[in-house]
Amino acid sequence: CYRKDMLAAAQLTPPSTTEALVKVARQLHDPAKGRYGIAWNAARGTPLGHTFSFLMAKFGQPIVDLPLHAGGFDFQNASGEQLRPMFQSDAAYRACEYMLDILKYSPPNILNMSWYERAQSYASGESCMAYCYTLLAPLIEFDKRSPAYGNTGYLSHPVGNHGRAITPIGGYALAIPANLSKERVEAVWTALKHLTSPNMSK
């Protein structure tokens, strides 16, 4: 999400690519006035892991080596080596570089920022843009005291090179434990496929 009023005042276009987002964040970033370019989940553990996984997708690579097909990536028939993490891929490297780029234009407490802190930073007017999720949208959309109230625009997450506009779901919390008994794996895999199916994602 982004502050429509701030971008308009600076004559900036809402960013649709990661490269454009860095440029807009840089131009809006003004720490002397207590204003920062972008808020995002960078706290240690799950918040940063979640950010990394969806940013890899924005650079064209799921977090595991899923096969590509006409509609995107085939997770329903993935098996074996296709389920290996892609942490040494070009997309993973680019996702890390991008996080280091936006870190420069983030609030001082960015390394302690997870979902609530990120939404609060944006809603309070501290940050001009944020990676948003609908769960905490009431902080923006229902609180008339928020500088972001009535001044917020929404975009799909910006894409990187080789990426495309997607909405990643799940990922970080959806996994099959390595120590799960073999007789339970198929049932858990079936449940995971159902939870991440197109019908459940709507």
Please report, for each region that a protein language model flagged, where it lies by residue.
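Stable alpha-helical elements in mature extracytoplasmic
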Residues: 3, 17-24, 48-55, 92-99, ...
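Periplasmic-binding protein-like
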Residues: 193-202
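Extracytoplasmic/periplasmic substrate-binding proteins
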Residues: 94-190
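Pocket-flanking alpha-helical
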Residues: 1, 8, 22-37, 50, ...
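Periplasmic solute-binding protein
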Residues: 1-16, 41-80, 168-177
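A conserved hydrophobic position in a structured secondary element of the catalytic/binding core
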Residues: 2, 132, 195-196
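Glycine-centered hinge/linker elements that transmit conformational signals in sensory
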Residues: 24-27, 66-112, 157
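Donor nucleotide-sugar recognition loop
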Residues: 11-22, 112
